[in-house]
Amino acid sequence: MNLLKHMNWAGDSKIYPEVMDELGIPDASGWDKGAFEREVGRLNPAQRANWDAVYGPMNEEFKKAFPNMTEKEKMQWRYQRYMQDYLGTIEAVDENVGRVLDYLEQNNLMENTIIVYTSDQGFYLGEHGWFDKRFVYDESFKTPLLVAWPGKVEAGSRVDEMVQNLDFAQTFLEAAGIPAPSDMQGE
Protein backbone atom coordinates (compact mmCIF):
# COMPACT_ATOMS: atom_id res chain seq x y z
CA MET A 1 0.00 0.00 0.00
CA ASN A 2 1.49 3.27 -1.17
CA LEU A 3 2.19 5.95 1.43
CA LEU A 4 1.01 8.78 -0.79
CA LYS A 5 -2.01 7.20 -2.45
CA HIS A 6 -3.45 4.73 0.05
CA MET A 7 -2.65 5.74 3.62
CA ASN A 8 -5.87 7.20 4.94
CA TRP A 9 -6.03 10.23 7.16
CA ALA A 10 -8.54 8.95 9.69
CA GLY A 11 -7.56 5.31 10.22
CA ASP A 12 -3.80 5.41 9.71
CA SER A 13 -3.06 8.98 10.81
CA LYS A 14 -5.74 9.31 13.52
CA ILE A 15 -7.19 12.50 12.05
CA TYR A 16 -10.73 12.92 13.34
CA PRO A 17 -13.39 12.81 10.59
CA GLU A 18 -14.67 16.23 11.64
CA VAL A 19 -11.16 17.66 11.16
CA MET A 20 -11.01 16.06 7.71
CA ASP A 21 -14.37 17.62 6.87
CA GLU A 22 -13.31 21.02 8.22
CA LEU A 23 -10.15 20.96 6.09
CA GLY A 24 -11.92 19.54 3.03
CA ILE A 25 -9.77 16.40 2.97
CA PRO A 26 -11.30 13.66 0.84
CA ASP A 27 -10.24 10.21 1.93
CA ALA A 28 -8.60 8.93 -1.25
CA SER A 29 -8.40 5.37 0.03
CA GLY A 30 -12.19 5.11 0.10
CA TRP A 31 -12.13 4.39 3.83
CA ASP A 32 -15.51 4.80 5.44
CA LYS A 33 -15.36 7.79 7.78
CA GLY A 34 -18.02 6.15 9.93
CA ALA A 35 -15.60 3.30 10.57
CA PHE A 36 -13.52 5.68 12.68
CA GLU A 37 -16.40 6.31 15.07
CA ARG A 38 -17.26 2.61 15.14
CA GLU A 39 -13.66 1.86 16.12
CA VAL A 40 -13.30 4.51 18.82
CA GLY A 41 -16.92 3.92 19.82
CA ARG A 42 -15.81 0.60 21.27
CA LEU A 43 -13.60 2.40 23.79
CA ASN A 44 -14.94 2.86 27.29
CA PRO A 45 -15.05 6.47 28.60
CA ALA A 46 -11.63 6.23 30.29
CA GLN A 47 -10.05 4.76 27.16
CA ARG A 48 -11.67 7.44 24.97
CA ALA A 49 -10.38 10.14 27.32
CA ASN A 50 -6.86 8.71 26.97
CA TRP A 51 -7.28 8.52 23.19
CA ASP A 52 -8.43 12.14 23.00
CA ALA A 53 -5.63 13.28 25.34
CA VAL A 54 -3.09 11.89 22.87
CA TYR A 55 -4.73 12.53 19.51
CA GLY A 56 -6.76 15.68 20.27
CA PRO A 57 -3.75 18.03 20.53
CA MET A 58 -2.18 16.36 17.50
CA ASN A 59 -5.37 17.05 15.51
CA GLU A 60 -5.31 20.71 16.59
CA GLU A 61 -1.67 21.08 15.50
CA PHE A 62 -2.48 19.37 12.22
CA LYS A 63 -5.40 21.76 11.55
CA LYS A 64 -3.03 24.72 11.85
CA ALA A 65 -0.27 23.21 9.69
CA PHE A 66 -2.30 21.50 6.95
CA PRO A 67 -3.28 24.53 4.83
CA ASN A 68 0.38 25.43 4.25
CA MET A 69 1.72 21.90 3.67
CA THR A 70 3.00 20.76 0.28
CA GLU A 71 1.98 17.32 -0.98
CA LYS A 72 5.42 16.03 0.01
CA GLU A 73 5.06 17.47 3.51
CA LYS A 74 1.62 15.87 3.84
CA MET A 75 3.06 12.49 2.89
CA GLN A 76 5.97 12.95 5.31
CA TRP A 77 3.57 13.97 8.08
CA ARG A 78 1.41 10.90 7.49
CA TYR A 79 4.45 8.65 7.48
CA GLN A 80 5.78 10.15 10.72
CA ARG A 81 2.36 9.83 12.38
CA TYR A 82 2.15 6.20 11.29
CA MET A 83 5.69 5.40 12.45
CA GLN A 84 5.18 7.12 15.80
CA ASP A 85 2.15 4.93 16.45
CA TYR A 86 3.98 1.84 15.24
CA LEU A 87 7.06 2.53 17.36
CA GLY A 88 4.86 3.33 20.36
CA THR A 89 3.26 -0.08 19.94
CA ILE A 90 6.69 -1.71 19.74
CA GLU A 91 7.73 0.10 22.93
CA ALA A 92 4.59 -1.08 24.76
CA VAL A 93 5.16 -4.67 23.64
CA ASP A 94 8.81 -4.46 24.71
CA GLU A 95 7.91 -3.11 28.15
CA ASN A 96 5.33 -5.82 28.74
CA VAL A 97 7.50 -8.66 27.48
CA GLY A 98 10.06 -7.32 29.95
CA ARG A 99 7.47 -7.54 32.72
CA VAL A 100 6.75 -11.18 31.86
CA LEU A 101 10.47 -12.00 31.78
CA ASP A 102 10.98 -10.24 35.12
CA TYR A 103 8.16 -12.30 36.63
CA LEU A 104 9.63 -15.54 35.32
CA GLU A 105 13.05 -14.59 36.69
CA GLN A 106 11.72 -13.50 40.10
CA ASN A 107 9.78 -16.74 40.46
CA ASN A 108 12.62 -19.01 39.29
CA LEU A 109 10.68 -20.15 36.23
CA MET A 110 13.14 -19.21 33.48
CA GLU A 111 14.82 -22.62 33.33
CA ASN A 112 11.49 -24.39 32.92
CA THR A 113 9.92 -22.06 30.34
CA ILE A 114 10.10 -21.90 26.56
CA ILE A 115 9.78 -18.30 25.44
CA VAL A 116 8.73 -17.60 21.86
CA TYR A 117 8.51 -14.08 20.48
CA THR A 118 7.16 -13.82 16.95
CA SER A 119 4.71 -12.08 14.66
CA ASP A 120 2.37 -13.06 11.86
CA GLN A 121 4.55 -11.59 9.07
CA GLY A 122 7.00 -8.87 8.23
CA PHE A 123 5.97 -5.27 7.71
CA TYR A 124 6.78 -2.39 5.36
CA LEU A 125 7.99 0.72 7.15
CA GLY A 126 8.34 2.94 4.09
CA GLU A 127 10.43 0.61 1.92
CA HIS A 128 9.41 0.96 -1.76
CA GLY A 129 7.19 3.88 -0.63
CA TRP A 130 4.86 1.38 1.05
CA PHE A 131 3.39 0.75 4.46
CA ASP A 132 1.50 -2.26 5.80
CA LYS A 133 2.23 -5.85 4.68
CA ARG A 134 0.28 -6.81 1.58
CA PHE A 135 2.93 -7.29 -1.11
CA VAL A 136 5.25 -10.19 -1.80
CA TYR A 137 8.66 -8.63 -1.27
CA ASP A 138 11.48 -9.56 1.07
CA GLU A 139 10.33 -7.28 3.91
CA SER A 140 6.96 -9.00 4.25
CA PHE A 141 8.60 -12.42 4.41
CA LYS A 142 10.96 -11.54 7.25
CA THR A 143 8.91 -12.68 10.20
CA PRO A 144 10.60 -12.17 13.56
CA LEU A 145 11.09 -15.32 15.62
CA LEU A 146 13.07 -15.33 18.83
CA VAL A 147 13.22 -18.40 21.05
CA ALA A 148 14.66 -18.89 24.51
CA TRP A 149 14.65 -22.58 25.36
CA PRO A 150 16.98 -23.55 28.19
CA GLY A 151 19.06 -26.60 27.33
CA LYS A 152 17.92 -26.62 23.68
CA VAL A 153 18.67 -23.23 22.12
CA GLU A 154 22.06 -21.64 22.74
CA ALA A 155 21.80 -17.96 23.69
CA GLY A 156 22.77 -15.70 20.80
CA SER A 157 22.54 -18.46 18.19
CA ARG A 158 21.04 -17.81 14.77
CA VAL A 159 19.32 -20.23 12.41
CA ASP A 160 18.72 -19.33 8.78
CA GLU A 161 16.29 -22.15 8.02
CA MET A 162 12.73 -21.38 7.03
CA VAL A 163 10.28 -21.74 9.89
CA GLN A 164 6.50 -21.66 9.80
CA ASN A 165 4.16 -21.05 12.70
CA LEU A 166 2.51 -24.27 11.59
CA ASP A 167 5.40 -26.04 13.35
CA PHE A 168 4.93 -24.37 16.75
CA ALA A 169 2.22 -26.67 18.13
CA GLN A 170 4.14 -29.80 17.14
CA THR A 171 7.27 -28.43 18.82
CA PHE A 172 5.45 -27.57 22.06
CA LEU A 173 3.72 -30.95 22.20
CA GLU A 174 7.06 -32.71 21.72
CA ALA A 175 8.66 -30.56 24.44
CA ALA A 176 5.84 -31.52 26.81
CA GLY A 177 6.22 -35.21 25.92
CA ILE A 178 2.77 -35.37 24.36
CA PRO A 179 2.32 -37.20 21.06
CA ALA A 180 0.83 -35.10 18.28
CA PRO A 181 -2.38 -36.29 16.65
CA SER A 182 -1.72 -38.12 13.38
CA ASP A 183 -3.76 -35.63 11.37
CA MET A 184 -1.87 -32.62 12.74
CA GLN A 185 0.26 -30.67 10.28
CA GLY A 186 3.69 -29.33 11.08
CA GLU A 187 6.97 -30.78 12.23
Regions of interest found by a model, annotated:
Residues 165, 169:
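Zinc-coordinating Cys/His ligand positions in small cysteine/histidine-rich zinc-finger domains
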Residues 1-162, 175-183:
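Active-site-proximal cap/lid insertion segments
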Residues 187:
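FAD-dinucleotide binding site
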